[in-house]
């Protein structure tokens, strides 16, 4: 008790001997620190998700589009290795070495923008892009500063893998396709865990400009970006030469795939009871498909 009182007296004496200016500065600094601690919302994303139903092995049985008309599967907790390697190589090479903001990337982007007299590079890290996706605000200088501040705060709260999962779950992939899982099924007809290197590379470059490069237009640009990324992966020895040759020979998908609708009545039921969530059933997808085919014939 005496020790606590002694410490309190020391703190009071410290403040008594401070000038008014120093007290004001200390108060401002304290408010800024408190503001920084609480500046990040507890929940970053406030968006509706698709209702997704899988079999007992996690295979997709069917899904219902989100209430805002987007194919946005519920957030995933992990990122497949191929996508992780592709994203970091393409978007943020120093992802594991910065605290949300990469000064080198910012400096390089500033130089390129001044040299070209227009914005050709943003210098945003994956953490900053995650904040941008969550805020969905106009891209201004002031907003960029806010993104940088919130990105550093997010780095204190979440692990690198959690941040990467947030990004891949909410990145735009063209049209009404949002997030890695929806994109994998819509563009390639299978789960993100089964993506090839070519497919992973295509999806890694797509959020960079989803309105300009996609399957219906800008296919040459999309293919060039994909192959350029694959070459970077080869140069970094992430993939070998035979894997590279096979990957660049893979064609782009022609058009989006329809999502599986193996158990539509079950999907409708979960849509009513567990809308916007993943629901794993005890059904075997292979058996369910066999029964459906036998029934329709």
Regions of interest found by a model, annotated:
Residues 2-295:
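Juxtamembrane regions of bacterial inner-membrane/periplasmic proteins
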